[in-house]
Amino acid sequence: MPHVAALYRHPIKGLTPERCDELTVQPDGRIAGDRVLAFRFAEAAEPEHRDGLDYWPKSKGLALESFPSLAALRVSYDGEARRVRIMHDDYLLVDSTLDTEGRAELAEIMTAFVLDSPEWKLLQREGRLPLALVGDGVRARFQDRARGFVSVHSEASVDALSGALGQQVDDRRFRSNVVIDGADAWDELSWEGEVRIGDVRFTAEGPIVRCLATHANPDTGIRDAKVLTTLTRSLGQDKPTLGRLLLLQSQAGGVTGAVGDDSGAGGTIRVGDEVTFG
């Protein structure tokens, strides 16, 4: 029987995932505590707009797609204290709050780290410095898509990819919120209609087309797995796809996905919850 094998949220966009025993799905369809902060380029410290919603394209801030070395950092966020702690190679780089002084210190440390990485030239492009740490540390708002969504993939799909690659692939490369076990490989790509995780009801939306972030080793930050070309050339996909987007249901249909929308029921999903679909 398909069930939840692992749950993740990513408090700071592009940085260390936090493994959880349970996650709260907010009425707006986003995961509480997921992507509540982001390091943005100077020219992109305010949101763009898409379909009437705030949109924060990952190409305009620190993200693994362009800055794979970020994966080598170990970042933790204390939501109650509003405090960010960043470590590298067991060395504490910074431990600061989200007040004005703390945000400046965090941005300074991240800037220094990236400028000392192989991707340093990318950060020196016009309009990118100084970095800005944006977000209130509470509202989930920096997902890749304006509408938010919950992301899910199956362990079997990752195992099939590992076989085609000839090396073991870590689930964390895909930065999904929900990892399921007990389903056949690639089943999630064919889901239609309602998907239920525990007591929370979703509607299956589009499959997730992957980017270069998946090439980065989640421990070292080195691009050591050609995930995209393996999905297309070896596994025959038209686009490099792994995983599915889920939209929270409401009595009126799907929620809008706007930050703070309260039309959905929300709820809690837990490791071990049964997953039904179709």
Residue ranges, per PLM feature:
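Metal-cofactor-dependent catalytic cores
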Residues: 1-278
